[in-house]
Amino acid sequence: SGSATAEMLHFLTACIRYGVSVCIAGSTGSGKTTIMAWLLSNVPNNRRLITIEEGSREFDLVKRDAQGNILNSVVHLLTRPSENPALNINQDFLLERVLRKHPDVIGVGEMRSAAESLSAAESSRTGHTVCTTIHSNSCNSTYRRMMTLAKRKYNMDDSILMQIMVEAYPIIVFTKQLEDRSRKIMEIIEGEDYQDGRLIAHSLYKYEVEDNVTDDRGETRVVGHHKKIGLISDSLKKRLLDNGISNKELEEFMQPPKEVG
């Protein structure tokens, strides 16, 4: 199978379209940015999309017709680092100003600092749909990674920060480059809450590696498949419905777990 199944991609697209923020986690070269760019390219043309990137611009999401007329509402922003604090334009600075433009969807290239971590989370918790990426080793450790970033600057209790992150990003996607250099979405989870020092989350989809087969030339091929593990919670279902998804579209994600792909 490919990096994900059609159902998995449809689910993630529906989340972004219907107001559920998504964080894509993984190491360098795992395909995080590629997946994020694909998801943002599927934002409906009538939604206002603003992206914020650091360093170089990787997104080009402006759509045009055959005559070159722009079809969608997209603004791409880049940071401009400076030693002079008065001239330094970082992601946190841009995020604050982006919110005044009333975007429907915000794409934050990557969360690297404490300020970005909390600013992006607060943007999501105040009704904006955020799609971002972060370096992390698994779905479940992603929330703790966000919390650790935020702790570098903000003297807040761990449990409060964890609750903020879980509320801000109900959906976490973990990507990985496997031994044969193929890139897979390894897992999608739904985070529901953080109580008594424990993350309450459940897996929705997983990629299960069955074997790593080496041929006569010494090249490895990964054998595996994607599997549907669980269903979205009633609260996420209600949120999607409240934000405009049809029961027909929702039905696909409510089918009992089975082998997919």
Where are these regions (language model features)?
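NTP-binding/hydrolysis catalytic cores, primarily Walker-type P-loop NTPases
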Residues: E187-G261
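Walker A (P-loop) phosphate-binding loop of P-loop NTPases
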Residues: G29
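Phosphate-binding/switch region of NTP-binding enzymes
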Residues: L161-D196
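P-loop NTP-binding catalytic core
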Residues: S1-Y18
